[in-house]
From Swiss-Prot:
Gene disruption phenotype: Results in a significantly enhanced level of extracellular gibepyrone A.
Disulfide links within the chain: none
Keyword Transport among UniProt keywords: yes
Gene name as annotated: GPY2
Species lineage: Eukaryota, Fungi, Dikarya, Ascomycota, Pezizomycotina
Highest taxon of the lineage: Eukaryota
Binding site for ATP: 635-642, 1231-1238
CC per GO annotation: plasma membrane
Name of this chain's protein: ABC transporter GPY2
ABC transporter domain ranges (all copies): 601-829, 1197-1428
GO molecular function terms attached to this record: ABC-type transporter activity; ATP binding; ATP hydrolysis activity
Localization: Cell membrane
Organism of provenance: Gibberella fujikuroi (strain CBS 195.34 / IMI 58289 / NRRL A-6831) (Bakanae and foot rot disease fungus)
């Protein structure tokens, strides 16, 4: 028996294990002093010196705190203790090794340096020093081990006591270092972001999440409950932008830029991931040591070894929990910063897009789906390389146990990795195609949402629904190719789990049987099985993580291609440069240069077209716009007036010639006013400083002051998406007020006064263009494009354009006036008359107040996680399909678990019995493993190609149907970003995240149940531990879910403003650039993006916290099992090996269950959103009854005491109206804005609510009929023409017109065929750039005239065309529908005389009706008064 006390010659060897004294269970003193003392000291000193140099340059932020003296006292005690240890070793030869003095001396130096670091860290850093805390935490137990060794040496008690005192002083230093100085120093403002102030211990334990979990458990979590993020995570940085053509992109240029922009965040996870890898591979060695310990009889010293084994299990498993937490936090930080970086780049690029190259619609897809995939790739980046390293290490260790048999498994592993890489590449390519299909669908969805009112009016909702569902089916078809690669990768990744042990152990057994007779012991079997489990898990991670990275790279390449698109550059030159050029090019030295202040815009030989292959719209234009006055550009519909203004604006580069403007800011009012989803005041002031007097003058000039007084919230009234909560006239006047307030020296007005009533128009013209008007009296140059000659008398200069886009005449009004009559016939629109005396101050009756612009019906029930969501989801996928899927998953689990049980029994057999049962061994391992593989493949096919595909189509159908069936007030009350989120993010979640979470949760849950049963059978007391810990973890899981669900909701809600702002800025890109508001919009983008970062990061951090709790659960269970085995010593090696092996797998299964179950709960939030949306959104359809086939056969309309309102919360728009309209009559409806004209027509279309009364058409009460059926029977020309990105042929088919010759003849009648034929004929894609506003109305009129019907409804159908075309189209309607009833809402009362009857409305009541010709001869007639008021 070795002596109890160790002598110096034994301890003065490197060891590392002492031999020849005590129980031989100890390190040698030399090993402890070199490896456990000097090495940590050297590392700490190096890091401390580097950190000191960094802190030295930083300012002092903490002063006058009592903690600092405590820290300095503690470190001085450490320094003194180190000196006493050195002193004792110098006088005690019996305990001094070769390294004792060196260790003590380095300790003294190190303590002094660390004390300096502590001083600087306290004064100049918010966070507790990680270097000091880690050093103290790691060396305190090492000092304890060193003291234990010294205590057992002869004459070693005094040095042992000195080392123990050193350890005690280090404990004091550790306590002082961990004190939260923000609170004690009363500097809470420095610690608003816990991630910046928390030390490494708090971060490892995720303590910062506890207040959030507690708040989320007690009350529904709100934004104010979330703490602030640190600056690096929350700040979205702007990047220098390259304008114009981009150089050829490098394949991974964007990836490199992101890496070098966030190098620390990308590299920070490496060290904790390596630690995690090291601790993971300690598990098989622990399994072997435990089985060795149990298999051997007890001897003296067994107790110490058992205690050491328990300590080793605690160190490894709890270490795994903490380093995994630190690693995942680092990965989350990298993901968060990349998300912010990419989102900001996409938004910044969207503001720079050249409209000729791209409209920017793809940016919405990239901002959601693509960024999401890049995030996942970044999150899995370090797991991917670590998995490859893990496979290599695992194979090396397996080879050490199985010998050459391990080489056989190498082929399977290599093949799996090669196939995984190949299929990952294919998956990336298929995913890009899928993303393109999603982008195409979302582009059309955005167009539908913008034109929803026109779609409903024309009864096109069923056709639009079919079109979008066809797009969805095409998208799903492309997704199947990606899903097939995913199935292949998932199946391949689990091949190693089922076949590696079978192949490796079978070959080993075969070789052992024939050669050395070596048996497969329980120690070797379960050590190798643990290694196989780690390798199999790593192979799964390799394939899944590589696929995630490849898919992320594919999305990154899409983003990079988007970022490398040609950006907008101002093609205009400075007017000064143009003047110098003119001077230098003058002949004979005679200067033709004008005084710079005389010319504001100079156009020289300019031709312009919207596409490279298209025909020129403006041809060889040359003119000068005089400074400081009004220049009118006049011409017929489609002549290129708007195009010319876009050229002057710089939004469109001329194909030839030069454009020169004064170096000044430009104000721009588009033909369709762009109104942002902000308040009226913010729309007018924008990015400019606020000046009260200027603001009031702009409001008064545009007749907005009284309107604002009548609004409840005044000028703080939100305008809504595209100005939905203000009237059409108010949109025009807000845009005009914006131009006036800007004080720009160049103002461009693109026919923006169309649709205003006469008095309002006269007021505005007098306020801004009269001799003392705001624009006339200011040093401002105004260019107004119009088809009307009534603005010509106000002009200082006139430019006339013919139908071919050529300038036919230019000059002053005096020069043009003699030719006015001929020009009116050839070029201009004749004077028409507005319909009303003045525009009302209240909102247009056809628009709704924006009471809840960001309202979302999300998670009323689903946010609380009721089981009804699961029941509803299972009902959607089908209960039988779910049972089949569950059965297949169960087959897979049985196929994985049963061979392990058999191996535990087989390894306990004798050599001969093992040899005799080899055939059954091969059969069970290969047969059952193959069954598991087939079951897994079948389950994946069943889920991804059957269940997921069907639910993808169904969920889109539900969202689309609910949206199209929603009442009009829904679209005014709900932000477009919220609705678009349903078609993008919610469907993205249900398409991929939900199926993956579903299969992961099901597989891991079944596997966990099986492993718990195995562990309980092999270690009975562990069953109680499993039950107790499972209850605790269950409570925490529920505690966690309340918060995580709400965080998911907040994440989605915070993302909606980002999408809304993106859509808003893209819609008004020309206006934003004109006013120079791009920087302002970038700041707004930064604000909404930074707000969206907070819930996203905390959602990811909540998942890390949950993983930490699961790891701690597994560590506790492993500790319980090994403690029971050590104490009882009545378990066989095979049983303990099976139990410990399953604990390793159980840990992965528990983490998998919790992770995937939580992911399932969170992703089911999207299902809950869909369910709640479909159940809670009010449908406009109250009846499914179809009218008779021939209805309406006469077109007779009867209103009987009808009261109409847009919402029950609003007063009626029309009250107690009774009206009879005879079949075949042609009725014009006029009145001031807000009088109820459009409401009357929309009531026939079911777009407003009938509070009382009955509306009948041909004696049929229309409230009893299906609204889509009613609308489809009418011919409707809406005020806002619908434009979709489809071909002319497909567009016509949407309205039931398929005869191509009929379509061509109709287009020829309206004069559009020549334009369309040049653009590709019926295959030409319709877009906002294809047609001008007037041509859109002509196109809508063409389709209307091709449709048959007895009732024709027209709402301002010709407001953007010239008078000749108006007359032509009106006559075309009369000729096409001679026997049909025609109702036409119009402001242009001069055209009403051709109708049979005119109906005049005021305040929702009929004030007059009759023959318009007769009424004009009655001086007291209201209609005659309106007509006279419209004369100029």
């Amino acid at each position: 028996m070795p002596p109890p006390n160790c002598l110096l010659h034994v301890e003065d060897t490197f060891g590392p294990v002492v031999k020849g004294c005590g129980s031989n269970f100890d390190f040698t003193l030399l090993f402890e002093e070199t490896i456990l003392c000097i090495l940590p000291l050297c590392v700490a000193i190096c890091l401390a010196i580097f950190r000191v140099t960094r802190l030295w340059k930083k300012p002092v932020i903490f002063k006058g705190c009592f903690i600092l003296p405590l820290k300095l006292i503690a470190w001085n005690l450490v320094l003194g203790s180190q000196a006493s240890v050195v002193a004792l070793f110098s006088i005690r030869d019996e305990t001094r090794t070769r390294a004792s003095i060196a260790a003590g001396s380095i300790g003294i130096v190190g303590s002094a340096i660390l004390a300096c670091l502590s001083f600087l860290e306290h004064q100049r850093a918010v966070r507790t020093s990680s270097i000091l805390v880690l050093y103290l935490l790691s060396t305190i137990p090492m000092d304890a081990a060193r003291a234990r060794t010294l205590w057992r040496m002869l004459d070693g008690r005094d040095p042992a006591i000195a080392v123990m005192v050193l350890g005690a002083t280090k404990v004091c230093a550790l306590v002082t270092e961990m004190l939260w100085k923000c609170s004690l120093a009363n500097r809470h403002e420095l610690c608003d972001a816990p991630e910046e102030s928390n030390g490494i211990i708090e971060r490892a334990l995720m303590l910062r999440m506890m207040p959030i979990f507690w708040a989320g458990y007690r009350t529904p979590l709100q934004t104010e409950h979330l703490s602030k993020l640190d600056t690096k995570l929350q700040n979205a940085e702007l990047r220098p932008s390259e304008k114009g053509p981009k150089r050829k992109q490098a394949p991974i240029k964007l990836a490199k830029e992101i890496f070098f922009s966030h190098t620390y965040e990308f590299l920070a996870p490496i060290f904790p991931r390596l630690c995690y890898l090291s601790l993971t591979f300690a598990q098989p060695f622990l399994v072997r040591r435990a089985i060795d310990y149990i298999s051997k009889p007890k001897t003296e010293g067994s107790g110490e070894r058992g205690d050491g084994l328990i300590a080793a299990y605690a160190l490894v498993y709890y270490g795994i929990a903490f380093v995994s937490s630190l690693y995942e936090q680092s990965a989350v930080r990298a993901t968060t910063v990349v998300r912010a970086d990419l989102s900001m780049r996409i938004y910044q690029q969207s503001l720079l897009l050249d409209r000729v190259v791209d409209t920017g619609d793809s940016s919405t897809t990239m901002m959601t789906a693509d960024v999401e995939r890049v995030q996942l790739g970044v999150r899995k980046l370090h797991d991917a390389w670590a998995s490859f390293v893990s496979v290599a290490i695992g194979l090396w260790l397996i080879e050490a146990q199985l010998g050459l048999a391990a080489l056989v498994t190498l082929g399977l592993i290599g093949g799996s990795l090669l196939l995984g890489g190949y299929w990952s590449g294919r998956a990336s390519r298929f995913q890009k195609n899928w993303m393109a299909a999603i982008e195409k669908r979302l582009h059309k969805t955005v167009q539908v949402l913008k034109g929803i009112k026109s779609i409903k009016q024309m009864g096109a909702a069923p056709a639009i629904k079919t079109m979008l569902e066809d797009e969805r089916q095409s998208e799903i078809k492309l997704s199947k190719k990606f899903r097939l690669q995913l199935i292949a990768l998932v199946t391949l990744s689990f091949t190693s789990l089922t076949m590696l042990p079978a192949l490796g152990l079978s070959v080993h057994n075969a070789v052992s049987d024939k050669s050395s007779g070596r048996i497969l012991t329980a120690q070797t079997a379960f050590q190798v099985m643990t290694l196989f489990n780690i390798v199999s898990s790593s192979i799964q991670d390799c394939t899944s993580h590589v696929m995630a990275i490849m898919v992320g790279l594919g999305s990154l390449q899409r983003i990079e291609s988007f970022l490398n698109q040609h950006t907008w550059t101002d093609p205009r030159k400075s007017i000064r440069d143009a003047s110098i050029s003119t001077d230098e090019s003058s002949v004979g030295g005679t200067s033709e240069k004008k005084v710079l202040t005389d010319v504001a815009v100079k156009i020289q030989n300019v031709s312009a077209k919207w596409t490279e292959d298209g025909e020129a719209i403006i041809r060889d234009a040359t003119f000068d716009v005089p400074a400081h006055g009004l220049t009118v550009v006049a011409g017929p519909t489609g002549s290129g007036k708007s195009t010319l203004l876009r050229v002057v604006l710089g939004d469109l580069a001329p194909s030839s010639g030069t454009v020169s403007v004064d170096d000044s800011q430009v104000a721009f009012c588009d033909q369709t006013p762009w109104i942002a989803n902000i308040s009226i005041k913010e729309n007018i002031v924008g990015a400019l400083p606020f000046y009260e007097e200027r603001y009031r003058m702009a409001l008064h000039a545009c007749a907005l002051d009284q309107d604002i007084e009548d609004l409840t919230d005044g000028d703080k009234h939100l305008c809504g998406l595209n100005g939905q909560s203000v009237s059409g006239g108010q949109k025009v006047r807000i845009a005009l007020a914006r131009a006036i307030y800007s004080k720009a020296t160049l103002v461009l007005l693109d026919d923006c006064l169309v649709g205003l009533d006469t008095n309002t128009e006269r007021h505005i013209l007098g306020e801004i263009f009269a001799p003392r008007g705001l624009l006339s009296s200011a040093p401002t140059t105004t260019i107004l494009a119009t088809s009307s000659p009534r603005y010509l008398p106000f002009a200082n200069y006139i430019i006339l354009i013919d139908a071919d886009g050529r300038i036919v005449r230019q000059g002053t009004y005096a020069e043009i006036a003699p030719h006015i009559e001929q020009l009116e016939h050839d070029v201009l629109q004749v004077s028409d008359h507005a319909a009303t005396a003045r525009e009302p101050r209240a909102q247009d009756s056809d628009e709704l107040p924006n009471t809840a612009i960001t309202n979302d019906i999300a998670f009323k029930k689903g946010a609380n996680g009721d089981w009804a969501v699961y029941k509803w989801y299972f009902g959607v996928i089908g209960w039988m399909d779910f049972v089949v899927f569950l059965f297949l998953c169960l087959g897979f689990v049985i196929g994985v678990i049963f061979p392990q049980i058999y191996l535990g029994l087989w390894s306990e057999k004798s050599l001969q019995n093992q040899i005799d049962t080899l055939p059954s061994f091969y059969g069970i391992f290969f047969g059952v493993g193959s069954m598991a593989w087939v079951a897994l493949f079948s389950a994946c096919v069943w889920l991804f190609l059957r269940i997921a595909v069907r639910t993808a189509a169904l969920f889109h159908h539900l969202i689309l149907t609910t949206t199209l069936n929603a009442r009009m007030d829904f679209f005014s009350q709900t932000d477009s970003g919220v609705t678009l989120n349903r078609f993008s993010q919610d469907l993205q979640i249900t398409d991929m995240e939900l199926p993956l979470a579903f299969v992961g949760a099901t597989m891991n849950l079944l596997m966990l149940i099986a492993q718990c049963i195995v562990v309980t059978i092999q270690s009975h007391y562990a069953g109680f531990a499993i039950l107790a810990i499972a209850v605790v973890i269950g409570f925490f899981h529920e505690f966690y879910l309340r918060t995580s669900r709400r965080l998911r909701v907040m994440d989605i809600e915070a993302r909606s403003p980002v999408l809304s702002l993106l859509l808003e800025s893209l819609d008004g890109l020309a206006t934003v650039r004109a006013y120079g508001w791009a920087a302002w919009y970038l700041r707004r983008g930064i604000e909404v993006l930074e707000r969206s970062q907070v819930p996203f990061h905390f959602l990811q951090s909540a998942q890390v916290t949950l993983n930490l709790s699961v790891d701690l659960f597994v560590a506790t269970l492993a500790l319980v099992v090994i403690s029971i085995a050590v104490v009882q010593m009545n378990t066989s090696g095979g049983s303990l090996g099976l139990a410990l092996f399953n604990i390793v797998g159980l840990g992965q299964s528990v983490k998998g269950v919790v992770f995937f179950w939580t992911s399932l709960e969170i992703t089911l939030g999207a299902v809950a959103r869909i369910r709640d949306f479909t159940e809670d959104t009010k449908s406009e359809h109250e009846s499914d009854t179809k009218p008779p086939v021939e209805w309406p056969s006469r077109g007779e309309i009867h209103f009987s005491d009808v009261t109409l309102t847009h919402s029950t919360s609003l007063p009626p728009t029309i009250s107690n109206l009774t009206l009879d309209i005879k079949p075949g009559s042609k009725m014009a409806i006029c009145g001031r804005t807000g009088s109820g004209k459009s409401t009357l027509v929309n009531s026939l279309l079911g777009l407003v609510q009938v509070s009382s009364g009955i509306i009948t058409i041909d004696d049929v009460d229309i409230s009893t009929l299906a609204k889509d059926e009613v609308r489809s029977r009418f011919v409707v020309l809406p005020q806002e023409s619908l434009i979709l990105s489809v071909s002319i042929r497909e567009y016509a088919k949407l309205f039931g017109i398929s005869d191509e010759q009929e379509i061509i003849q109709g287009l020829k009648k309206t004069g559009l065929w020549q334009t369309i034929e040049q653009g590709g004929g019926l295959d030409m894609i319709a877009s906002s750039d294809t047609f001008s506003h007037g041509e859109r109305q002509l196109f809508a009129m063409t389709l209307a005239c091709l449709k048959k019907g007895k009732l024709v409804l027209m709402d301002e159908p010709t407001s953007h065309v010239d008078n000749d075309i108006q007359t032509q189209l009106r006559q075309a309607v009369f000729d096409t529908f001679p026997d049909s009833t025609v109702l036409c809402v119009t402001h242009q009362v001069a055209t009403i005389v051709d109708f049979d009857i005119v109906l005049v409305l005021d305040d929702g009541k009929i004030v007059e009706q009759g023959d318009p010709k007769e009424l004009l001869h009655q001086p007291t007639s209201r209609f005659a008064q309106l007509y006279s008021a419209g004369e100029l």
